[in-house]
Amino acid sequence: MTPETIGILGGTFNPVHIGHLRLATAVAEALKLKHVDLMPCAVPPHKPDSGLLPFEMRVSLLQGALETPPNASPSDARLQVSTLEGELPHPSYTWNLITEWRKRHASESPMFILGGEDFMHLDTWHRGLELPNITNFVVVPRCQADEETFRATIGRHWPKAVITEPDENNLLSAAITDETSCLY
């Protein structure tokens, strides 16, 4: 039996906005994910803490954003809030998060969702270039992270990766290791 795939969308969510929810819903729908765990970063190492709302408040705001107001269509049940980051040592590193997530969800497969800008700078993250060893990626293009940049980043960090041509949904795929891939 193949494991079910769960999306993981991390971020400070300071504040949560409709773009976060639309992105998570679109990825869940396009890739037929079981659900997407929205994971507020407890103590982000790349961002100064000035102006950062407390972790518990950001979690509450995110949970509130997923609640369905009266007389509205139901929110997407595939979106769930996870507080796992709050249980881990600080600062919050994606490597630690994915490692712990995999321990707790051994029968499921993670699909880490991140923006093109973040993907281009994985080499600055704690064990960032090792992340393809423990998770698959969905890289969401932004205005500065076009297809050429995606290909260049893959080639620079993982020269043995195999990149496919865009499919019918205009998704590129890169097989980074024998077991992990990256969609753009």
Residue ranges of model-derived segments:
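Nucleotidyltransferase catalytic core that binds NTPs
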Residues: 1-184
